[in-house]
């Protein structure tokens, strides 16, 4: 598989998981770089991932919970709508990760049945395994 490169032009960044160009906000840049790392360094495929996926089972009241990046063990698991394997929450590079951010993301992971959670601002990464 060819390397996935982050593409930016005219204030936009290409989102391969959505198949479209988005405004290149700082958090979006971190998100797209993380997706490229997942593909290029860890061997995940785009067809086993989703971006900004609404989570069911969230206890956020009337609001909606969206996971920045979701990874399933395989495309077949994603297509069968099985529990996610990994939930990733990203923040802009200049945003310090706080314990509240970590708990928010880990709750998203638990709600979705994921086994693993990662929070990243590109500089610092936190992660947890959830044993079921």
Model-identified regions with their sequence ranges:
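A short, conserved, highly charged catalytic patch centered on acidic carboxylates
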Residues: 1-116, 123-132
């Amino acid at each position: 598989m060819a390397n996935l490169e982050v593409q930016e032009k005219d204030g936009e960044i290409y989102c391969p998981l959505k198949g479209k160009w988005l405004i290149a906000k700082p958090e979006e840049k971190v998100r797209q770089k993380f997706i490229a790392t997942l593909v290029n360094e860890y061997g995940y495929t785009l067809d086993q991932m989703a971006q900004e996926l609404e989570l069911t089972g969230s206890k956020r009241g009337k609001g909606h919970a969206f996971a920045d990046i979701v990874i399933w063990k395989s495309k077949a698991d994603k297509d069968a709508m099985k529990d996610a394997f990994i939930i990733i929450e990203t923040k802009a590079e200049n945003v310090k990760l706080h314990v509240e951010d970590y708990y928010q993301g880990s709750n998203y992971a638990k709600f979705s049945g994921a086994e693993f959670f990662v929070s990243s601002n590109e500089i610092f990464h936190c992660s947890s395994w959830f044993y079921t």
